[in-house]
Amino acid sequence: MAGAGLRAAARRWLLCGGQGGPRAASSSPSCPGCGPPGPGAHCPSTPRSAPADGADLSAHLWARYQDMRRLVHDLLPPEVCSLLNPAAIYANNEISLSDVEVYGFDYDYTLAQYADALHPEIFSAARDILIEHYKYPEGIRKYDYDPSFAIRGLHYDIQKSLLMKIDAFHYVQLGTAYRGLQPVPDDEVVDLYGGTQHIPLYQMSGFYGKGPSIKQFMDIFSLPEMALLSCVVDYFLGHGLEFDQVHLYKDVTDAIRDVHVKGLMYQWIEQDMEKYILRGDETFAVLSRLVAHGKQLFLITNSPFSFVDKGMRHMVGPDWRQLFDVVIVQADKPNFFTDRRKPFRKLDEKGSLHWDRITRLEKGKIYRQGNLFDFLRLTEWRGPRVLYFGDHLYSDLADLMLRHGWRTGAIIPELEREIRIINTEQYMHSLTWQQALTGLLERMQTYQDAESRQVLATWMKERQELRCITKALFNAQFGSIFRTFHNPTYFSRRLVRFSDLYMASLSCLLNYSVDFTFYPRRTPLQHEAPLWMDQLCTGCMKTPFLGDMAHIR
């Protein structure tokens, strides 16, 4: 019975997602979960007293290690897995849908979700363009698209031909830097950046993900681009061919652009919509439900009308335009949100442009280009009563949230897979023990004799192995798109900054009423609440491992 109350409390903490802070320190020596200590009783969470002078410090440290190991094993119930719902909507800001009167949407990867089968087609077409039009070596044709290589949100240092993952504080995550298809050793990465992992602000990507020498790959279409870039670099390095990094980067990005400009991607999708377009019936259900509840809808996309029309007919039906109050195609986002000079032009049923001046935006009509300032003037849709959904954090959401006060929703298809991984027992146990071990390392570093340092080095090695295990569960090369080992990624930082809500697909809206209020959970700062497993039982003591931390005052 001694540990039953404590274990029950810890289980409740875990099942509640770790919300809430530590118990207030008590002057009583008893453990709140275990009752008064009896003769010889030992709460598994209560720290052993500091060893006496001359005691075997190594044995003391390993005893602490085993205590923590048992605690983690006992307090992590099976039901803690599968807590997160992949179909849920997650909130960065509090937002009530009852306040939203107008819903706006991007098209690609928002209204229309595409199958991963599209990526090999883009890769192969751009690879062949490089060979046939840019005269790159024929040997590059041996490379095929590898869907397991890259993840979204990576940065590419053009001058160094380095593809890497950067955290929210501009630090390269060591072990995630690749030149071509080969990992770059950590010490070489540090040397490349002047003895540090930090990327200075002036080199980093700017507001729209582009910097003077470093680009961030933010949209889903960039996955085949990163793969092709890495394959071409790999070929040149493997064959000892000299190349200019800037020219190579530009040629690859131009080849990828040609796939879009020439309409190849549009042709593939139009020829087999059943293969490439996913969840079309769910898109129809979302739009119909919103209209049935009196919401106004609009569409702003960079795609051409003929392509959008065929896709919407496939998903929604021939009368799809009657669902939308305004439809804008070839909008040229993100310039649409900042450039006041481009006027709207009306398209007729055949896709021909009209020359008359646009003084109002009519339901059922199609408009091309334009700009947000005229859009706001003509519709009077302003501020928090507008909620716009898109997949590109920069091109779709950044300006709308920061400059115009719209509410924004990010569509992140990768979220579904990542949540399923987080829900696995392997991930949960690995991460929890990793956090507990980190806490032990932090507290036990006060012991600096030779034997203790050897124990701590063993723990450090185990911690690094655990980090690599959890990273590889998501992607062997780069890990999760949302986290480095312990910090949010640069991608996550932008996701939180530019979106009120984020979800795996638009269909997640079907799980909530149209007047639902989303409440973000209070995220504790480092100084506010010690919530990890190694500190769960701080109610048992005034200060965790007080004897070991006596040097801190």
Swiss-Prot record:
InterPro entries: HAD-like_sf, HAD-SF_hydro_IG_5-nucl, HAD_sf, Pur_nucleotidase
UniProt keyword list: Cytoplasm, Hydrolase, Magnesium, Metal-binding
Broad class of enzyme this protein falls into: hydrolase
GO CC list: cytoplasm
Enzyme Commission numbers on file: 3.1.3.-
Gene Ontology biological process terms from the UniProt entry: negative regulation of catecholamine metabolic process; negative regulation of dopamine biosynthetic process; negative regulation of oxidoreductase activity; negative regulation of peptidyl-serine phosphorylation
Keyword Hydrolase attached: yes
Region (Disordered): 26-51
CDD domains per the UniProt record, alphabetical: HAD_cN-II
Pfam families: 5_nucleotid
GO molecular function: 5'-nucleotidase activity; metal ion binding
Active site: D106, D108
Expression tissues: Expressed in eye iridocorneal angle.
Summary of the function given for this chain in its UniProt record: Promotes dephosphorylation of tyrosine 3-monooxygenase TH which decreases TH catalytic activity and leads to reduced synthesis of catecholamines including dopamine, noradrenaline and adrenaline. The exact mechanism of activity is unknown but may act as a phosphatase or promote the activity of phosphatases or may inhibit phosphorylation by acting as a barrier to interfere with protein kinase access.
Subunit comment: Interacts with tyrosine 3-monooxygenase TH; the interaction results in reduced phosphorylation and decreased catalytic activity of TH.
Protein name in the entry: 5'-nucleotidase domain-containing protein 2
Biological source species: Rattus norvegicus
